[in-house]
Amino acid sequence: MRLLFRFLTLVAVLAMSLADVAPAWALTSRIKDIASLQAGRDNQLIGYGLIVGLQGTGDGFRSSPFTEQSMRAMLQNLGISTQGGQSNAKNTAAVMVTANLPPFASPGSRIDVTVSSLGDATSLRGGTLVMTSLSGADGQIYAVAQGAVIVSGFQAQGQAATVTEGVTTAGRVPGGAIIERELPSRFKDSVNLVLQLRNPDFSTAIRIADIVNGYASARFGGPVAEAKDSQEVVIQKPRTADLTRLMADVENLIVETDTPAKVVINERTGTIVIGSDVRVSPVAVSYGTLTVQVTETPQIIQPEPFSRGRTAVQPQTDIAAEQTGGRVAIIDGPDLRTLVAGLNNIGVKPDGIIAILQGIKSAGALQAELVLQ
């Protein structure tokens, strides 16, 4: 646990050092890194396919009958008769195939696809995804996927034991889908550009509009940008401007960013991420744990010889209570370094830090948003 506290302290020191030494570098970004074009969003594709060539780790046809039905239908489409008994081979698996169709993608370009097992297959390693059509929300086919599946995890099993590391029932096919249909796009005919901030913030939106207006005034003779809210900035197209060139110039402008202070907590893994802008008001924290251990040690009582008695079991319960911690620490400071140092002084575990942060927030001493995952 000391390594965790040292790591948190190191992160705090680095964050404060960077803020003191190079504030301009730490707080500025290109517009393309903090905002995306509304007309340039991704579209999701989905399909159903089969993976073949597995080494006995595929679906069982009894527990996954849809896999056998799909395989028979595929073979019939290839002109192969499927009449006969049921196959017991487990080298085929039914999968869902998903992909993201990037904006302005043209036919012939390739995209990555993700495959996920539907049946009781134990591993997709070594398999090959056969030709699978990928459709959009409108039901139209936009891409066709096929190729070797790459799985990061592995599995080894014997008659009495199985060892699995990572996820073996999902994988990727890099560049496995070929785009067959492009999405209708009217980017060149648009009269404005709408930028959407990835982290909505009014201050950042206003600064983007000001930076773009400064560029437009020097280039086109007048302002063209307006911040609609904390997430959207609308840029009107000047008459003499080419929209593609305008977007290329705008996305490379440097803007000073600002985000609200947050503390992100994942209670399942015990992960705690504290932003550099977190502020803490003076607060006293006491943390202690009470451990109660109940142990059952039954005693066997034997009767005296020739007494015609019976062997009996007498229950015996031992209860031990132990209280640890209980120290009081006063956290008084304006920055992240003070918060981390105060938690280190108490010497609690990650689950205790989570409880303390929630308590500090409830007391109104944590000047940040507490995000629980």
Curated annotation (Swiss-Prot):
Cellular component GO terms held in the UniProt record: bacterial-type flagellum basal body, distal rod, P ring; outer membrane-bounded periplasmic space
GO MF annotations, alphabetized: structural molecule activity
Taxonomic superkingdom: Bacteria
Alphabetized Pfam families for the sequence: FlgI
InterPro entries: Flag_FlgI (IPR001782)
Main location: periplasm
Subcellular location as annotated: Periplasm; Bacterial flagellum basal body
Signal peptide from the UniProt entry: 1-26
An example Gene Ontology biological process: bacterial-type flagellum-dependent cell motility
The entry's keywords: Bacterial flagellum, Periplasm, Signal
Assembly with partners or alone: The basal body constitutes a major portion of the flagellar organelle and consists of four rings (L,P,S, and M) mounted on a central rod.
Job description of the protein: Assembles around the rod to form the L-ring and probably protects the motor/basal body from shearing forces during rotation.
Similarity-based family: Belongs to the FlgI family.
The protein, known as: Flagellar P-ring protein
The species this protein was found in: Rhizobium etli (strain CIAT 652)
Recorded name of the encoding gene: flgI
